[in-house]
């Protein structure tokens, strides 16, 4: 899984039928402090995340291992909303 920050939403009025009803969010990989570091990825949202939240997302076949995405054509899925990141005994990120 990868730490990421939700930076936007994606709306598609016409979709492949198997992804109908999925919430799609734009996520950028981030460092343990929550600062975005990478390019944006469109993720299916399995947990109800929102813009500005730090999340864990998985890609590839792991992205299709949730109840929401099972057997659906998705390549990245938000699996968790992060509350706290601790590294070496130091809190690097804490959700407000």
From Swiss-Prot:
The keyword Kinase does not apply. Keywords: Bacterial microcompartment. One of its GO terms (cellular component) is bacterial microcompartment. It comes from the Bacteria. Artificial BMCs can be made in E.coli by expressing (Hoch_5815, Hoch_5812, Hoch_3341, Hoch_5816, Hoch_4425, Hoch_4426, Hoch_5814) or (BMC-H (Hoch_5815), BMC-P (Hoch_5814), and 3 BMC-T (Hoch_5812, Hoch_5816, Hoch_3341)). Cargo proteins can be targeted to this BMC. BMC-H can be modified to place its N- and C-terminii in the interior of the shell (called CPH). Fusing proteins to the C-terminus of CPH allows targeting of cargo proteins to the lumen of the organelle composed of CPH, BMC-P and BMC-T1. Its main location: other. PROSITE patterns: BMV. Disruption phenotype: Not essential for BMC formation; when an artificial operon without BMC-P proteins (Hoch_5815, Hoch_5812, Hoch_3341, Hoch_5816) is expressed in E.coli BMC shells are made. Residues 1-83 form the BMV domain. Signal peptide: none annotated. It is found in: Bacterial microcompartment. One of 3 BMC-P proteins in this bacteria, the others are Hoch_4425 and Hoch_4426. Forms vertices in bacterial microcompartment (BMC) shells. Expression of 5 proteins in E.coli (BMC-H (Hoch_5815), BMC-P (Hoch_5814), and 3 BMC-T (Hoch_5812, Hoch_5816, Hoch_3341)) forms 40 nm artificial BMC with a molecular mass of 6.5 MDa. There are 12 BMC-P pentamers per BMC. The shell facets are 20-30 Angstroms thick, with 1 of BMC-T trimers protruding to the exterior. Belongs to the CcmL/EutN family. This is Bacterial microcompartment shell vertex protein. It comes from Haliangium ochraceum (strain DSM 14365 / JCM 11303 / SMP-2).
